[in-house]
UniProtKB/Swiss-Prot annotation:
This is Large ribosomal subunit protein uL1. One of its GO terms (cellular component) is large ribosomal subunit. Belongs to the universal ribosomal protein uL1 family. Its main location: cytoplasm. GO terms for molecular function: RNA binding; structural constituent of ribosome. The keyword Transferase does not apply.
Length: 219
């Protein structure tokens, strides 16, 4: 899709209007609390019997979560790297074994993005991480673990499954600059449209909301 065609499909994302709505959402929330902001999308034109499900990891321009929920599952070679870079990690050897099952389950529950060093399969199966709705990154030779960690902060999962009628993704939180939230929305919607078989023709409605507020219609 050309850049012009993409811009035409997302013309409803006028910056002035959307940033104004974001500001109103933020003002309606308790300033002492940080609340997640997400986009909800109603879809049309899909046949659940024929169309393929969509599961994508989207990397947005700005951090989407207020708290670090990224963890390195570290082998011996990467423990020192994590310590030097002040990255949260758990050593594989320290949480392996039947007697550490509760610790492993707690780590899995508390974190969203997992950086998996070689040997991670001693404690976690990839399919179980995915089944829990988490986002894994298997560290390859040459990967910069700091860069991967920063990417994790900006990543969110997009799923279009089951009846294909609705999907959603996180775009930020009420502690962020409204302009940054807007940029995350714009990039996220651009990626979503690129994954849809008929582009913006598959969009039925687009809304923005916080964890606590009713949705506000954008499209």
């Amino acid at each position: 899709m050309s850049k012009q065609a993409e811009e035409e499909q997302l013309a409803f994302l006028d910056s002035g209007r959307i940033i104004g709505i974001i500001n109103q959402l933020k003002e309606s929330e308790d300033p002492e609390k940080i609340v997640t902001i997400q986009i909800q999308v109603n879809l049309k034109g899909f046949d659940p019997r024929k169309d393929n499900k969509v599961s994508k990891d989207m990397v947005l321009p700005y951090r989407v979560r207020s708290l670090d929920k990224t963890i390195v599952i570290a082998d011996e070679a990467h423990v020192k790297v994590c310590i030097d870079a002040n990255l949260p990690y758990v050593p594989i050897d320290e949480i392996s074994g039947d007697d550490k099952k509760d610790i492993r389950e707690s780590v899995l529950k508390k974190n969203k993005f997992f950086i998996l060093c070689p040997g991670y399969n001693k404690i976690y199966q990839l399919k179980n991480i995915l089944r829990c709705g988490k986002t894994p990154h298997i560290l390859r030779n040459g990967d910069d673990i700091n860069a991967v960690f920063e990417t994790g902060k900006k990543s969110c999962k997009l799923r279009i499954q089951d009846d294909f009628s609705v999907t959603s993704f996180t775009v930020g939180h009420t502690g962020m600059d409204s302009e940054h939230i807007y940029e995350n929305i714009k990039v996220g919607m651009g990626l979503l449209v690129s994954y849809l078989k008929n582009g913006s023709q598959n969009l039925k409605g687009v809304m923005i909301k916080t964890d606590q507020s009713p949705p506000v219609t954008l499209y």
